[in-house]
């Protein structure tokens, strides 16, 4: 089984979106360089960001998101983002009316079921958990192995927190084993202390 990694771009003060679910400049680093990050050529980053991000993306076998993220992205029109093979959606509701049953999206109830399904789908590859409320719940349940943050130099002041609104016991992370500076971003990777 692959590692379970919590990830998002995040403001310096710990937010993944503002109060209106807008990311503001959190993804500007994805268009601030000259090295294409994906086949579309729309994402261009610095060489250091490419060397960190592309291998990570290539290792992801499944991503877990909450129904809220699924809804505000319109389910990415049935195509998982960044070339990911499968998306597991944590929800108490069924798939949307008219949703293509062949789309590689899996709707499950509860975080434990979501992690189990994602690990089954990913095999030995990574399971990525989107930061926010679902990510915070998975961390609180002790199911996260690593925390990755792409810290962007902006202060939101309020909004949607990286670790969500979950009131969980304190979790100690190890010292970062990766610290990489890109254009408009600082990439950090923390193993979760067990």
Identify the meaning behind each predicted range.
Residues 1-194:
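Enzymes that bind and transform nitrogen-containing heteroaromatic metabolites
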